[in-house]
Amino acid sequence: LEHLTLSMGAMLAGVPFSAISPAYSLISQDFGKLKHIFEVLTPGMVYASDGQVFSKAIQTCATSDIEIITNTGIVGQQSCTSFQSLLDTPVTNVQEFYQTLDEHQIAKFLFTSGSTKLPKAVPTTHLMLCVNQQMLLQTFPEFEQTPPVLLDWLSWHHTFGGSHNVGIALYLSL
């Protein structure tokens, strides 16, 4: 839920985000795909649920000016911001940021699997996310009468899990 909270906050603030496959951090030994993604995105913030688990990947790929957010654990000697401290921050200017959102702004970047080479960034706008959900509702009008029960194991870094299924839950207020 922390990832979803950060994602929704980023979209509301008009800051594009990207969910990255954990395999690029936890299975890869050279972090080649993750390094490539860092070069493409130049992130200002990185979130890892457990800093210690993702420490090697973060230390290898993230520059010292990138803010690291964790639920637990530390990343080497690097200073990390706790996720809880973000929740404890007083809310300001939300309406102001909301008013500046444009449907054509990039909401998030999805990445291809990289099975043919390096992962490629796929920009996804706010409009694309909304239109996709409206298309689903028109394709499956019964969703409005009887909302589906989602048993979801799909990763949020994948378009099906992160856009389709999360979108259904948000769009139908599940």
Language-model-detected regions and their locations in the chain:
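Internal alpha/beta domain cores that form substrate/cofactor-binding pockets in large enzymes
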Residues: 18, 56-71
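Conserved ATP-dependent adenylate/AMP-binding module captured primarily in the ANL superfamily
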Residues: 24-60, 88-91, 132-151
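Conserved AMP-binding/adenylate-forming
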Residues: 1-28, 148-155
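Conserved AMP-binding/adenylation subdomain of ANL enzymes
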Residues: 130-149, 156-174
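A short helix->loop->beta-strand "cap" motif at the edges of active sites that frequently abuts
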Residues: 15, 43, 63-67, 174
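Conserved pre-ATP/AMP-binding loop-to-beta segment of ANL
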Residues: 69-71, 75-111, 117-118, 142-150
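Short hydrophobic alpha-helices that are characteristic scaffold elements of the AMP-binding
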Residues: 7-19, 36, 40, 158, ...
